[in-house]
């Protein structure tokens, strides 16, 4: 009987098909009270001239997580931001070139740290505001089925992405299945606001912020306004009373009544996941 080493030496990798694997990175930020997403404009086929989520093929010497960190730095110029694996998109026909499986990640990037530019394979890069992501039965179905791709096929709401200059694109205008990926990411973030500290990942300075800044982030992700009093009471109950935010003193140099500044104390047990 041959040893494992002998078996591996004679193993024929051509016995099985080898799908390509990519990482797609949804780089979100909050600016001007809106949730914004970094997209790149493709300068190559397929989907030449279409806007797309930045990403790239997985290298043979890196893990998916390492590839995601690399691409966030290449596209947005940042490191050490909150990132998490979103979902694996594996529809057989999702890429017209060949069989490609995409591992999607979302990244929460403070706007003040964002330094984006068009990289390899892109003519342009821009921040788009994100609107039109619907809720309702489709969300319940995706959770029950544990299959966002199937649930999104039944989604009647359309995704609307708008540049500050006013140019808008819909989900149908995006490359590949990136509209589905974006919808899935927005819903993931909305669902996690109440039981994780995800919103704090968007703060420009977690050591010195106001509750108004934090509320604006929540509203941007949720896509609607929140009652100011209820929000403050919830944050004070869930965070200040638990010692996860602490007062730093009143804001200086502000017009009108100064706001209280807070500092976020990261709790590894809750953090972002």
Model-found features: residue ranges?
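N-terminal strand-loop-strand
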Residues: 6-52, 80
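Long, intrinsically disordered, low-complexity Ser/Thr/Pro-rich regulatory/activation regions
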Residues: 243-273
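Active-site segment of metal-dependent pyrophosphate-handling enzymes
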Residues: 19-21, 65-69, 73-170, 174, ...
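Short, Gly/Pro- and small/polar-rich lid/capping loops
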Residues: 1-5
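Terminal low-complexity/charged segments
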Residues: 7-11, 18-31, 90-97, 102, ...
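Structured surface interface patches that mediate subunit assembly and partner/cofactor docking
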Residues: 202, 236-241, 254-257
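Conserved Nudix-box catalytic region and its N-terminal flanking loop in Nudix hydrolases
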Residues: 34-79, 88-90, 192-220
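Charge-enriched amphipathic alpha-helical scaffolds
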Residues: 225-247
